[in-house]
């Protein structure tokens, strides 16, 4: 699973997800891509599950690029802990995804194979997504 090797600070504030993705919204590497259509935090486990689903389907052919990286720590308090006594310890990592963000790219396979691989990956993610290709226009 993906996570940063080291960070400047152990804990982060939650922040807000407003507006569309300003960067990372165009196809850069592959011919087909999976684009987010709603905002969400995507965990490193979900990214890994989607990657596995795609690689199992396309087998040896094709190349996959993961365009999102979980760099935000999410903290949790232990169960049945009283209020106070500070912020919890980091439990897992998330990638902040805004609408329009390209999450996965794929090349070296036919459109039918790419469409099905992206569909399988999208089932592992908690958001609505859109399949885009170099031929089509996208947000």
Curated annotation (Swiss-Prot):
<dbReference type="GO" id="GO:0003735">
    <property type="term" value="F:structural constituent of ribosome"/>
</dbReference>
<dbReference type="InterPro" id="IPR047873">
    <property type="entry name" value="Ribosomal_uL16"/>
</dbReference>
<dbReference type="GO" id="GO:0006412">
    <property type="term" value="P:translation"/>
</dbReference>
<comment type="similarity">
    <text>Belongs to the universal ribosomal protein uL16 family.</text>
</comment>
<dbReference type="GO" id="GO:0000049">
    <property type="term" value="F:tRNA binding"/>
</dbReference>
<dbReference type="GO" id="GO:0019843">
    <property type="term" value="F:rRNA binding"/>
</dbReference>
<keyword id="KW-0694">RNA-binding</keyword>
<protein>
    <recommendedName>
        <fullName>Large ribosomal subunit protein uL16</fullName>
    </recommendedName>
</protein>
<keyword id="KW-0687">Ribonucleoprotein</keyword>
<comment type="function">
    <text>Binds 23S rRNA and is also seen to make contacts with the A and possibly P site tRNAs.</text>
</comment>
<dbReference type="InterPro" id="IPR016180">
    <property type="entry name" value="Ribosomal_uL16_dom"/>
</dbReference>
<keyword id="KW-0820">tRNA-binding</keyword>
<dbReference type="GO" id="GO:0022625">
    <property type="term" value="C:cytosolic large ribosomal subunit"/>
</dbReference>
<dbReference type="InterPro" id="IPR000114">
    <property type="entry name" value="Ribosomal_uL16_bact-type"/>
</dbReference>
<keyword id="KW-0689">Ribosomal protein</keyword>
<keyword id="KW-0699">rRNA-binding</keyword>
<comment type="subunit">
    <text>Part of the 50S ribosomal subunit.</text>
</comment>
<dbReference type="InterPro" id="IPR020798">
    <property type="entry name" value="Ribosomal_uL16_CS"/>
</dbReference>
<dbReference type="InterPro" id="IPR036920">
    <property type="entry name" value="Ribosomal_uL16_sf"/>
</dbReference>
<dbReference type="Pfam" id="PF00252">
    <property type="entry name" value="Ribosomal_L16"/>
</dbReference>
